[in-house]
């Protein structure tokens, strides 16, 4: 999967899940999204809180080829689950790498699934797929399960800081300023195309948490 599943290094190792790193820039310096090894999480979030300029970049096709090829050389087939196509074009890079490698390894199988999810929801899907693998399900069975059940994961989340919604162009500067004054916490989720959709504008953190709990009960 991709590092954007937001599982810990220890969890990836314990579940025997391989991952490829995205990239990000912090104040013009590029880092690998390598789960806090290049820059500790506390330093990263402190820099963001201080107003650092941030930018992300997806994995390119060449990087995917370098990531996939050792498995193929070892005689293994591959099932790779990507970050949602609704927020990233990374699946396109993975598909290009798949096509290139299948020409060189015609006896091997490379299956790619668009998770239509992100962060801990994406990680939850990966955990379930690892369970199926450990139960002895075949690669094709795990692939079909992922395709069929990926939308059973519901993503609901909020932020009390509108700064990065403004920087990302999701809300205007005016709306961000007004929202900050009024203590508005946007509640978002991911739709069936894996896109981030603002659903509610709720005043105060306590009320938005209550709404998320209600959504958990609704979709459980």
Language model segments and positions:
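N-terminal glycine-rich anion-binding loop in soluble enzyme alpha/beta folds
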Residues: 1-63
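Mixed-charge interfacial surface used for oligomerization/domain docking
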Residues: 4-12, 17-23, 79, 86-99, ...
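Aromatic side chains
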Residues: 31, 44-45, 64, 68, ...
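Glycine-rich phosphate- or other oxyanion-binding loops that anchor nucleotides, phosphorylated ligands
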Residues: 49-85, 92, 96, 143
């Amino acid at each position: 999967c991709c590092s954007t599943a937001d599982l810990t290094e220890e969890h990836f190792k314990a579940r025997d899940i391989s991952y490829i790193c995205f990239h990000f820039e912090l104040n013009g310096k590029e880092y690998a999204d390598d789960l806090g090894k290049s820059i500790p999480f506390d330093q990263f979030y402190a820099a963001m809180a201080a107003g650092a300029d941030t930018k992300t970049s997806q994995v390119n096709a060449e990087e995917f080829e370098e990531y996939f090829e050792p498995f193929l050389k070892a005689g293994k087939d591959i099932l790779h689950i990507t970050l949602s196509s609704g927020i990233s074009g990374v699946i396109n890079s993975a598909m290009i790498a798949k096509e290139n490698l299948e020409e060189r390894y015609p006896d091997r199988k490379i299956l790619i699934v668009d998770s239509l999810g992100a962060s801990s929801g994406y990680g939850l899907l990966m955990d379930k797929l690892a369970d199926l693998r450990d139960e002895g399900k075949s690669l094709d069975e795990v692939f079909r399960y992922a395709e069929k059940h990926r939308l059973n994961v519901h993503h609901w989340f909020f932020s009390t800081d509108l700064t990065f919604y403004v920087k990302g162009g999701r809300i205007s500067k005016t709306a961000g300023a007004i929202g900050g004054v009024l203590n508005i916490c946007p509640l978002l989720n991911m739709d069936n195309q894996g896109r981030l959709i603002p659903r509610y504008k709720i005043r105060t953190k306590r009320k938005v948490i209550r709404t998320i709990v209600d959504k958990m009960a609704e979709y459980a």
